[in-house]
């Protein structure tokens, strides 16, 4: 069986690394240290012209949660259209109400935008913040979401494997289940074999040093070590090889 490897990319550089490591698909973002925000059009255009990767673009206007006011919502709709017009193969997004349920009208409208371009609608890990994963996934199916990214409502997919397995068993023939968070070359196959999913999402992260992140009196560091995170093509290839049974 062929397994799909999706890499969480935070830039055009990351996309190139994912391609070098033989990923099948990327979720293109910016600001991964905030959980991933909407990418620039330039990063999408460069990725599509330089690689053969399937590119799902994140549409998320800010950090924090997923209950959006009118300004953020309109920004998301407009961003989705621009990204789709410039070659995105799909859009990853999530709308929740204050009570942790799926915001049906906003989700429905976003899906309608995506389907105008015949592209994929992906509900991201906002799903992991919902109050009831079963009623939530049934709602997403009714709204014609193609795929849901989930860690099984735990911090790591390995911790949420029971729910992932159950969702795959009950709904896997109606919606694609994409497991993500904490997946690497050492645990991917075990998770796949246990849950019966066929695709995984990973950051394959490494850290690079930039001395200009701080000086004696000023710091722009977010991890305290004057480093920033990028995708490692070596880790991508290791994960890909593990999925292909080469390790």
In which residue ranges do the predicted regions lie?
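Catalytic cores of alpha/beta
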Residues: 10-20, 67-79, 128-143, 167, ...
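C-terminal alpha-helical cap/extension of soluble enzyme domains
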Residues: 171-247
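Active-site-adjacent beta->alpha loops and helix N-cap segments on the catalytic face
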Residues: 13, 32-53, 71-73, 97-114, ...
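Conserved, mostly hydrophobic/aromatic
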Residues: 18, 83, 110, 124, ...
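Hydrophobic faces of well-ordered beta-strands that scaffold small-molecule active sites
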Residues: 3-9, 26-28, 55-59, 91-93, ...
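Glycine-rich phosphate-binding active-site loops on the catalytic face of alpha/beta enzymes
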Residues: 26-37, 82, 86-98, 145-158, ...
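N-terminal pre-domain/capping segments
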Residues: 1-39
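Structural motif corresponding to the early beta-alpha repeats
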Residues: 45-84
């Amino acid at each position: 069986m062929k397994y799909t490897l999706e890499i969480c990319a935070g830039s055009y550089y990351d996309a190139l690394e994912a391609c070098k490591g033989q990923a099948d698909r990327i979720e293109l973002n910016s600001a991964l240290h905030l959980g991933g925000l909407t990418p620039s059009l330039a990063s999408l255009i460069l990725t599509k012209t330089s690689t053969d990767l399937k590119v799902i673009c994140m549409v998320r206007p800010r950090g924090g949660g997923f209950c959006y006011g009118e300004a953020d919502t309109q920004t998301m709709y407009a961003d989705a259209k621009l990204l789709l017009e410039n070659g995105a193969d799909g859009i990853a997004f999530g709308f929740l109400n204050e009570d942790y349920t799926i915001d049906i009208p906003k989700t429905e409208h976003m899906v309608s935008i995506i389907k105008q371009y015949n592209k994929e609608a992906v509900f991201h890990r906002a799903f992991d913040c919902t109050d009831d994963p079963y009623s939530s996934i049934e709602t997403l199916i009714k709204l014609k979401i193609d795929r849901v990214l989930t860690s099984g409502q735990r911090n790591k997919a390995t911790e949420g494997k029971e729910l992932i397995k159950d969702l795959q068993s009950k709904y896997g023939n109606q919606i694609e289940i994409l497991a993500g968070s904490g997946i690497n070359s050492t645990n991917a196959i075990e998770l796949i074999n246990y849950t019966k999913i066929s695709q995984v999402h990973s950051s394959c992260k490494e850290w690079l040093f930039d001395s200009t992140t701080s000086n004696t009196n000023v710091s722009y560091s977010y991890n305290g070590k004057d480093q920033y995170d990028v995708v490692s093509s070596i880790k991508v290839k290791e994960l890909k090889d593990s999925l292909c049974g080469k390790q």
